[in-house]
Amino acid sequence: MSNTTLKMSQQEIIYELKYAWSRQKSVSIRFLQNSQETTSQGKIFGIDYDLLYIKEENLVRRIALDDILSINI
């Protein structure tokens, strides 16, 4: 088995982000950070051009939209 990471299409990611943000639902986002796969959980705080802001308890994390691999609501 190869060591490849499956990625949602950009269109699917944007649709899921907008849905979760409009309804203030908690999300789990899988993304690349320094070439490592990372998971973040929280509520979407905002979207600005090519960045996503997600609030995790008392921390706001900034994630580039191009680095997002998948999102689960």
Pin down the residues of each PLM region.
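Short glycine-rich, low-complexity segments
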Residues: 1-39, 57, 62, 69-73
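Short beta-strand-initiation
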Residues: 37-40, 47-49
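Short, conserved beta-turn/loop elements at beta-strand boundaries and strand-helix junctions
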Residues: 47-52, 73
